[in-house]
């Protein structure tokens, strides 16, 4: 299982189409994380100012219609993530049938991501 962060509104925008975030057009792949702790570090580094619910998609990489390549962070991983960590990059749109679940990023009073919890 790999994780992908997405604002809830973005995920719900086109429910009948494969998911294609802006990073697919900009970077050529969809950024994902290998585990919950890394996902929280990414949320704190890049999504701290996101307004509204921030979700973590739980993606079954075996069910994807496209390939996943495990690559190092470029230029560096977010704070708290070991330098040697490899990140799963999905080189194509995410078919929604590969999304096995969705969790909400829980934040503290300062907006820091502290846990993943059930979406309510």
Feature annotation, model-predicted:
Residues 1-120:
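Conserved, structured core segments of small domains
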């Amino acid at each position: 299982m790999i994780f992908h962060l997405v604002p809830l509104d973005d995920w719900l925008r086109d429910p009948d189409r494969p998911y294609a975030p802006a990073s697919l057009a900009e970077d050529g792949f969809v950024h994902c994380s290998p585990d919950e702790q890394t996902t929280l570090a990414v949320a704190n580094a890049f999504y701290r100012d996101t307004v509204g619910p921030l979700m973590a998609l739980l993606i079954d990489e075996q069910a994807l219609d496209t390939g996943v390549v495990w690559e190092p962070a470029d230029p560096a991983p977010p704070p708290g993530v070991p330098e040697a960590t490899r990140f799963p990059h999905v080189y194509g749109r995410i078919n929604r049938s590969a999304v096995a679940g969705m969790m909400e990023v829980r934040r503290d009073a300062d907006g820091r991501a502290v846990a993943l919890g059930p979406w309510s």
